[in-house]
């Protein structure tokens, strides 16, 4: 065991924090506590049931994995209490539905637009991840694909000027298609839909994605403390201060709160560390769940919307993930669609009217069942949704993270690491497991690096 580590405090009962506690327990280290500011587990992967009986996630989550440790945790916690799905996703483009990925299925655009995209792809010189995201897109996909889909869609998702973003994060996030593959799809009228790690995915039978983490928290017992908001941290004395005025000591601290908020909570933090944290950018998402008194109809999983006149960038056909996401599990009577609309410091959220804009958008795009009555409109705010990979992000993290580690503070998870490329649930769980092994056994972490 790492010397002098007798107490581990964990901030946040989301995927990373809970996985860390579970691994500490497995390693025989019992002196840990989780402090969660909310009333239940899940964090960004949480779920709620609205007053009308619809279940909603805090975003368009699906459960897939790169890691055996995540698979083992899911099997242990959920067993067979999950559905398995094959992805069926589309891009809503000019009234048509183009199978995802857009750039792999140009034959749905019609001859002229398909030709524009193919010529652009043929002439594209190839992008370097050393440049900005906007330049990388055009150099990789050419003008046609960039103009029609890549730029408008990513502007909607990131709510950030794309020139401010790096291109170092794209490996599992953006499907890169070559000219021969795109041409084959057009000429032979073949769909090319298999790309990506989420081509197949799982989803809990009831309770939404949050059910995974509610069960995991329950299995860990009373050392998971809810409604315990950390408001201050004395890194020298290794002391946490809480909103209720109480204090708790620690020897090692695993924080899954956003790293900018972690730094802001620290006493006597050097100016360079504070400035680096303040330079980090993120987007928020307004999640609007809309339930209808109508069967869900088509079996697609989710759909992307590059059109700037539509507020949301993605819609999830949530009743298709599990019938228990609608009242009484009655998908013969109810449909439910989870929409996501981004905002940021560059594009503030609408002050009012988003619910109406969303329901209008669902009707205009043909998602809403014809002549169906609204059964529920439920809005939630995910203030921290996407950690933006800006061009200055890595430099800022190289300033912050070593300073924290030198003081026994390990900032991990989607917003603790602030690295979107390792920001899925399986990544968060893996980071939690790895940091527990580092603390107890001194082992090197496998996916996180400063």
Task: Tell me the role of every PLM-derived stretch.
Residues 5-6, 60, 250-251:
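Local beta-strand N-terminus motif with an aromatic residue
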Residues 6-34:
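N-terminal Rossmann-like FAD-binding beta1-loop-alpha1 element of flavoenzymes
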Residues 16, 40, 260:
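Conserved Rossmann-like nucleotide-cofactor binding loop
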Residues 25-49:
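Glycine-rich FAD pyrophosphate-binding loop
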Residues 96, 106, 113-238, 246-252, ...:
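Active-site/ligand-binding neighborhood in enzyme catalytic cores
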